Amino acid sequence: MLVTGDLIQDDTPEAYERFRELMLPLDLRVHCIPGNHDIRDLMRPVCCRPPFSYCAWEEIGDWLIVGIDSCAEEDAGGRVTIDELERLAEIVSSSPAKHVMVCLHHPPVPMGSKWLDTVGLRNGDEFLERLHTLERVRLAAFGHVHQEYDAEHKGIRIIGTPSTCRQFQRGSDDFAVDENPPAYRRLELLADGSIHTELVWVSE
């Protein structure tokens, strides 16, 4: 399971422990990355204990999956630091995997929503260019936007997933929520580098 940030709403250690308790019965490895609403110092102790991991990587078949931190201090928008870009490059270069999926919280491309695009990834162009230099990156997956997104950027699939809470109205100039229910996404990463995906909307 990949959790692309904003794990909790109230900034307490107990909230992260509650998240952990809710996930454990699924009996899955849970890869977590921080979102702009997360408090890293509270999140790490909980999400570094197996079967959870924090900004980690894993090789599954022909794929390498890497979680990176795109959060910036005191900024709802994000930035992938030079150190984090170098960490990503080192992980990819040391892996024999044929295909790479990178997970982050903030969208590296505009969403076409005036207010939401002010809190995207500040260095999205730089981030995408670095992904292209790594050559094996096939997919970048993100959260943050509370809506569906699926497009391609110079051969790299860019996918955003709706929230497991409430959704934002697509294309809106100002903050607005819509009536869509919570959702999650299933991903099938195939040996030839292709990607099959399905959105699952969860009715109450």
Please place each PLM-identified region on the residue numbering.
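Divalent metal-coordination and catalytic microenvironments
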Residues: 1, 6, 19, 35, ...
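Core catalytic region of metal-dependent phosphoesterases/phosphodiesterases
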Residues: 1-51, 60, 133
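Active-site environment of divalent metal-dependent phosphoester hydrolases
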Residues: 9-14, 36-43, 73-76, 107-112, ...
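Short, electropositive alpha-helical surface patch
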Residues: 15-29, 119-128, 155-164
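Short acidic-hydrophobic surface loop/beta-edge motif
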Residues: 55-61, 149-153
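Active-site-proximal beta-strand elements of phosphoester/diester hydrolases
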Residues: 62-71, 101-104, 156-162, 198-199
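His/acidic metal-ligating clusters that form di-metal
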Residues: 77-159, 193-195
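Binuclear metal-dependent phosphoesterase catalytic core
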Residues: 130, 149-204
